[in-house]
Amino acid sequence: MALSASLHLRQSQSLVMTPQLMQSIQLLQMNHLELTQFIAQEIEKNPLLEVQSPSDEASTAERGDSGPQPEEAGSEIDEGAGEGDVYDSATSRSGERLSDGLDSDFANVFPDDTTPQRADAPELLGQWKSMPGASDGESYDLDDFVASRKTLREALIEQLPFALESGSHRLIAQYLIDQLDDAGYLHADLAETAQRLASASEDVTRVLDVLQQFDPPGVFARTLGECLGLQLRARNRLDPAMEALVGNLDLLARRDFASLKKICGVDEEDLIDMFAEIRKLDPKPGTSFETGSFETIIPDAVVRTAPDGGWLVELNPDALPRVLVNHEYFAEISRSCRKSSGEQIFLNECLQNANWLTRSLDQRARTIMKVASEIVRQQDAFLMHGVGHLRPLNLRTVADAIKMHESTVSRVTSNKYMLTPRGLYELKYFFTASIGSAENGDAHSAESVRHRIRTMVNQESADAVLSDDDIVDILKKAGVDIARRTVAKYREAMHIPSCVQRRREKRALARVG
């Protein structure tokens, strides 16, 4: 068969994952900290990007510019960009001029083009901003003027000159101090430490024995039993019976009191006294010291009560990055560059990337607003009455309601938080599995059922401990159709012991009390 060359025309459509589209998808699932770091990197690479400072916002407010009013949950949001958009209107117009030259259509990525809502929630945001580390820099917090507490490392180093005189021993001690975790436990291998410091193993062991006498008692322990033993020794309470107890903490965790009485050689009354002594100890002695900076969770959305009794859903302005495109700088540089030069090509690419980024951030804010509003509409009973009234909800229900893809909702709810009158919750918290009703009524959420189980266990007495079958019967009377194995699974997930172990523990605690 002879080979021949021919030319054929074929028309087809295919989905192409462009770099801009990948960036938009990544922005959706970033939390506030990741987004801030990403924007800082983009600003370093793109000279046309800038972040609006709080002083610029204040001057804008003095000129009379105002943002849009908050929308009530479940209400329609006006189409198009308004005067109170998060980003500069010039940026949006420039983005529209460049959209024809991009590989992807924004309508395919973000089907909705509604405007994000920005407003202040005085009550809830005031509570959140009063937390340490949540200040916006415009007001003073008395906590900022309080002297910071000592860290565990500083407290231990202060005790070194009074305990160790040898310079080599102090070097070993400083190395061991650096190996402590925040709880005060030592995870370093002594043989490896001796080899690394070119010291004798006996010297390392001798230094460790001295360090284990430092305050707070229990530091430099390698296990929980050793930590409790060090604290008991400091109280002069480490007798053979107590030493046997801390050496068999696994039996204590299983509530195997009969075996503990036999191993410790004590009667039930003495064992109860030993339990009371153990309860006074600190399993993490290092946590009482300053451990460094804490990462403050910044809510992406805020929910507060509306004047008419409904709910107002607002985006947290502190979580919205104010990224703008400097068109004046672009025009000034363009006048001094030839159109075909490499500098002009670089500027055009920077302008295109900057406009894409600002619009992607704008669409991210709008998407978060729509998802948060729908969650509030679906979980209205939770906001009014608490966890026991949390409804079963899945991603598809929210996606269908806001006419977006299920994967988009999943990305938006990852690592995003909403401040409600009942506390700060991750958006994923509101999505729970469904448990059927025993009387063909409304389904119950798994989280609300777990809350009921926890409440029943907390309210039981030592003489009336509920078994899994008893919990099933109570839930069925309340209209929850649930199997015994499901109750056992929920109980174990919440680290609730079995009824036999709870009965032993409650009776022991009743005698101690």
Curated annotation (Swiss-Prot):
DNA-binding span(s): 394-413
Q: Which GO terms describe its molecular function?
A: DNA binding; DNA-binding transcription activator activity; nucleotidyltransferase activity; sigma factor activity
Biological process per Gene Ontology, one example term: DNA-templated transcription initiation
Q: Where is this region: Disordered?
A: 52-137
Q: Where is this motif: RPON box?
A: 483-491
| A Pfam entry, by short name | Sigma54_CBD
Q: Which UniProt keywords apply?
A: DNA-binding, DNA-directed RNA polymerase, Nitrogen fixation, Nucleotidyltransferase, Sigma factor, Transcription, Transcription regulation, Transferase
Q: Which GO terms describe its cellular component?
A: DNA-directed RNA polymerase complex
Mark out the compositionally biased spans (Acidic residues): 73-86
Q: Which family does it belong to?
A: Belongs to the sigma-54 factor family.
Q: What does this protein do?
A: Sigma factors are initiation factors that promote the attachment of RNA polymerase to specific initiation sites and are then released. This sigma factor is responsible for the expression of the nitrogen fixation genes (nif operon), glnA and dctA for dicarboxylate transport. The open complex (sigma-54 and core RNA polymerase) serves as the receptor for receipt of the melting signal from the remotely bound activator proteins NifA, NtrC, or DctD for the expression of the regulated proteins.
Q: Identify this protein by name.
A: RNA polymerase sigma-54 factor
Organism the protein comes from? Rhizobium meliloti (Ensifer meliloti)
